[in-house]
Amino acid sequence: MKIINPYTEILTPLDGQAILQHIELCGRVCYKSEDKITDTSAAKFVAGIIKRGHEAVLEHFDITVKFVCDRGVSHEIVRHRMASYCQESTRYCNYSKDVFGSEITVIRPSFLTEGTPGWQYWKVACRMAEKSYFELLDWGCTPQEARAVLPTCLKTEVMMTANLREWRHFFKLRTAPAAHPQMREVAIPLLHQMRSQVPVIFDDIEEATHETV
């Protein structure tokens, strides 16, 4: 059994200025104000439409992100219906195969400290689940049948593609203090990364949500 930390990877090449210019070009059609486009007008225009709540314009650019997280967190991610997803399938992935190292991979729980009794109980439970999974496969079960005993903390990979408007909605929900701690564990660093690469778009998301997990 392998234990790893969750992480994200932005797969879409991001040029912040080019993104703002693209959004401005689309948005100015509404007002037929294309003549006001300059080399420096995009940031002000985009900030203005966000302030006015005209966020439909932000739907003209998509970003794809790869999430490596546990199955429980993935269930929260895919609730965002205005997005497209591909996810590692426990129906077809047979973790007894060499390609998976003949072991399951689980996500380290952020709420448990390594070496404590809670950590040890969790680790034993995961190993028992792995053992039961392999025994079911040996007995003749298919991966989609044997997966019934796999833990919620099983590592999964999710590809999420969403437009900028939906990413704003995602971050407002998933970085909030009320969000699940393991959801915040991946969402907050991702928000920081997007803010650093795409100016203006995420600047108004409350600073209180940026606390370190």
PLM regions with names:
Residues 1-213:
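Family-specific signature for flavin-dependent thymidylate synthase
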